Swiss-Prot record:
Protein name according to UniProt: ATP-dependent RNA helicase RhlB
Region (Disordered) residue spans: 386-421
Record domain Helicase ATP-binding: where: 40-219
Gene name per UniProt: rhlB
Taxonomic classification: Bacteria, Pseudomonadati, Pseudomonadota, Gammaproteobacteria, Enterobacterales
GO terms assigned for molecular function: ATP binding; ATP hydrolysis activity; RNA binding; RNA helicase activity
Short sequence motif named DEAD box, residue ranges: 165-168
Organism: Enterobacter sp. (strain 638)
Length: 421
């Protein structure tokens, strides 16, 4: 983490369990981020917390540190059974659940607490095998958790810690009934440590906190501006006919180390992927139609640097921490103002700088006024020369098979591309 992203508060200054401190120091975590510095004194005192912070500022480690400390410092129920986890962490998407599990593994290795993972799409029997051996901390999506609970593969009667991550997204995706179903099968609220984290603490999220938490303390870390001051924002007004050529020209000119391109529909994403893959870019596609195993592999390839560009719908816009994203392209301006903030928040994280480029085409330009009102400033406009756009581009590839991942590898230097004139 960048030092500009940290506070002067050390983890070692808190009365954290020694094994938790050891795990944090092994990972190089010595100083707290602002949300960690605010949340930990409360959770260590046994207080419930509803936290708001800009994405990428350490929310996950705040609740993981709290959960591991609590379980190590408080004994399990005397009659706890093997199918009863002690902590439950709920996430809105499979990708976020997998990421939280990965972040928790170093803590689990040091402390000896066992992790379980439960998400839909695939891996039912593999996940179940882990659960049947007994887990302390279960991380998952609500649908698969309910499935296991209804079949008595898990029992929530011994839960001591509950975490609800990206609570606003849970509402957006219609999971609130599932959340309440799971809460009703846990011990009473005062008998648990309850944590809720969200990019926004809207009225409905606060209502959920009031309903399911024990006099939760609200902690908020407000950014200087909603879009983050380290993100350079830029806006172009292309015609529909020039939009794809402008995107490809900007990619050639910027030559980003790692970029995410967002579009509003899966069909638009597939079209963008096809053009970039045909043009020789190392590009992956992430939409709801991509099989779960392939989604995880694409994310791993992108994080590892085997892919330079990821084309995605908003399924990837919330919660995922992919380090070192240098550029975000809004091929379509989103219909939801918050999605603009979450999209461009994939770059400029943890003290790094980033570049966001948005294309306000004829179809989605009307969304700009609401977006600028929401973020509190105008997005700087840039102009382009239509005659300087790339030409003679190859026809796009089509998804004629069940593949949706990697295009051909591109070489390390920009190719010469003919331009008119």
């Amino acid at each position: 983490m960048s030092k500009t992203h940290l506070t002067e508060q050390k983890f070692s200054d808190f009365a954290l369990h020694a094994k938790v401190i050891e795990a944090l120091e092994n990972k190089g975590f010595h100083y707290c981020t602002p949300i960690q510095a605010l949340a930990l004194p409360l959770t260590l005192a046994g207080r419930d917390v509803a936290g708001q912070a800009q994405t990428g500022t350490g929310k996950t480690m705040a609740f993981l540190t709290s959960a591991f400390h609590y379980l190590l410092s408080n004994p399990a129920m005397a009659d706890r059974k093997v199918n009863q986890p002690r902590a439950l962490i709920m996430a809105p998407t499979r990708e976020l659940a997998v990421q939280i599990h990965a972040d928790a593994e170093p803590l689990a290795q040091t402390t000896g607490l066992k992790l379980g993972l439960a998400y839909g799409g695939d891996g039912y029997d593999k996940q179940l095998k882990v659960l049947e051996s007994g887990v302390d901390i279960l991380i998952g999506t609500t649908g698969r958790l309910i499935d296991y609970a209804k079949q008595n593969h898990i029992n929530l009667g011994a839960i001591q810690v509950v975490v609800l991550d990206e609570a606003d997204r849970m509402y957006d995706l219609g999971f609130i009934k599932d959340i309440r179903w799971l809460f009703r099968r846990m011990p009473p609220t005062p008998q648990r440590l309850n944590m809720l984290f969200s990019a926004t603490l809207s009225y409905r999220v606060r209502e959920l906190a009031f309903e399911q938490m024990n006099n939760a303390e609200y902690v908020e870390v407000e950014p200087e501006q909603k879009t983050g001051h380290r993100i350079k924002e830029e806006l172009f007004y292309p015609s529909n006919e020039e939009k794809m050529r402008l995107l490809q020209t900007l990619i050639e000119e910027e030559w980003p180390d790692r970029a995410i391109i967002f579009a509003n529909t899966k069909h638009r994403c597939e079209d963008i992927w096809g053009h970039l893959a045909a043009d020789g870019h190392r590009v992956g596609l992430l939409t709801g139609d991509v099989a779960q195993k392939k989604r995880l592999r694409i994310l791993e390839d992108f994080t590892r640097g085997d892919l330079d560009i990821l084309v995605a719908t908003d399924v990837a816009a919330r919660g995922l921490h992919i380090p070192a994203v240098t550029h975000v392209f809004n091929y379509d301006l989103p219909d939801d103002c918050e999605d603009y903030v979450h999209r461009i928040g994939r770059t400029g994280r943890a003290g790094a700088s980033g570049h966001s480029i948005s294309l306000a085409c004829e179809e989605y330009a009307l969304n700009l006024t609401a977006i600028e009102t929401y973020i509190g400033h105008s997005v700087p406009q840039s102009k382009y020369n239509p005659d300087a756009l790339l030409s003679e581009l190859p026809p796009p590839k089509r998804l004629t098979r069940a593949r949706s991942g990697n295009g051909p590898r591109r070489t390390g230097a920009p190719r010469n591309r003919r331009r008119p004139g």
